[in-house]
A protein has these predicted regions:
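Conserved, charged catalytic cores of large soluble enzymes
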Residues: 1-53, 113-123, 161-186
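Structural alpha-beta junctions
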Residues: 2-7, 58-59, 103-105, 143-145
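Residue patterns forming the tRNA-binding/recognition surfaces of aminoacyl-tRNA synthetases
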Residues: 20, 67-186
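Catalytic-site beta-strand/loop segments enriched in glycine and acidic/polar residues
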Residues: 31-93
């Protein structure tokens, strides 16, 4: 980034030394970020799920160790970016798994039609996959003087097996009934 406006190295810190540090997020001013227990509000009472303390997303911003999956593989691996990753438990499978383990509140921003719900300020009502929404995110970050540089970065997304369209992760409450027993009653 030195070419894009300059910087000076003031020191070097190993990632392990950062674990536990608290920080302010770029969109902590949004109502959804300040909702105790997550957004939309959870359907369980405090204490019914591990780590549920009814804290807002803003109150839980901290640097964590990304951990490992069930096979012992690092969840965040070298070669996939900076090595510092924001966990968004309502926006991705791995994020949701790690967030649940750590008791982080879940912010599930998308409605059924793929637009941001109420509580997301200028993003409310906008389609998540619309390039204009990404541009608005960049504009908001610039206003807050939090944007250093923008570049296109390849990112692996799930795709529909039939159409090839990119899919967005949307957290929903669902339940299923196991119907395997029906053959036994005939």
């Amino acid at each position: 980034f030195k070419e894009q406006g300059g910087y000076e190295v003031e020191g070097t810190v190993r990632g392990a030394e950062m674990v536990g540090w608290r920080y302010g997020g770029p969109f902590d001013d949004l109502a959804a970020q300040q909702e105790p227990g997550g957004y939309p509000p959870p359907l369980v009472a405090p204490g019914e799920s591990p780590g549920a303390e009814w804290k807002s997303s803003v109150e839980t911003h901290r640097v964590i160790d990304g951990g490992r999956d069930s096979k012992g593989n690092a969840l965040v691996v070298a070669g996939e970016g900076t090595g510092i990753v924001h966990m968004a438990p309502g926006c991705g499978d791995v994020d949701h798994q790690v967030g649940t383990q750590l008791g982080l509140p879940v912010i599930a921003p998308l409605q059924e039609d793929g637009t941001f719900g109420d509580g997301f300020g200028p993003f409310s009502g906008r389609r998540a996959i619309d390039p204009a929404t990404a541009d608005l995110v960049f504009e908001e970050l610039k206003k807050k003087e939090l944007l250093v540089y923008v570049e296109t970065y390849p990112h692996i997304y799930p795709h529909c097996w039939r159409t090839g369209d990119e899919l967005v992760f949307r957290l929903v409450d669902e339940w299923f009934i196991n119907m395997d027993w029906r053959d036994e009653i005939k």
